[in-house]
Amino acid sequence: MQCDLSEKHLLITIILSIFAKEINIDSMVRYPVGIQTFSEIRKRNCLYVDKTQYVYELANDMKYVFLSRPRRFGKSLLTSTFGSYFSGRKDLFSGLSIEKLEKDWTEYPVLHFSLAMAKMGTPEDLFNQINMQLNRMEKQYGLTRDGDDVATRFYNLVNNLYDKTGSQVVVLIDEYD
């Protein structure tokens, strides 16, 4: 007797529902498949290998950090973790190493540039992408556009944010390659 695809799907669904009743689904490990943001991993209670001690050390011992690793090595997740840390999101770090290391949890303005989805064939494409992200950041922080070219706008955004908050500005750049 042969089963067509829909019958196989139904059979698999029935078997899974039987197992789901016997296994506490909530106690199963949730893997963060396709999730690259630290906040989402923590909010969804997904498996997270705690490397926050190194985040703390890099943030407090280095002024500039450049990470160059192969694709799929966790650069975006690490960049997102830095973003949450510098945004003062102590709630996301509950139970992790950094919770014991950090005393102040200062909130800094964070400019997070990501070129992940950008299709750039020309320098003009790159400038357009950066301009779009500058627009988003200016709105996010309630600032008006200050300057015409990318370099001037970026310089003014950093300085205006510093003037507005009195805090150093953190710049994160992801998917630059």
Model region roles, listed by residue range:
Residues 2, 8-177:
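Phosphate-binding site recognition
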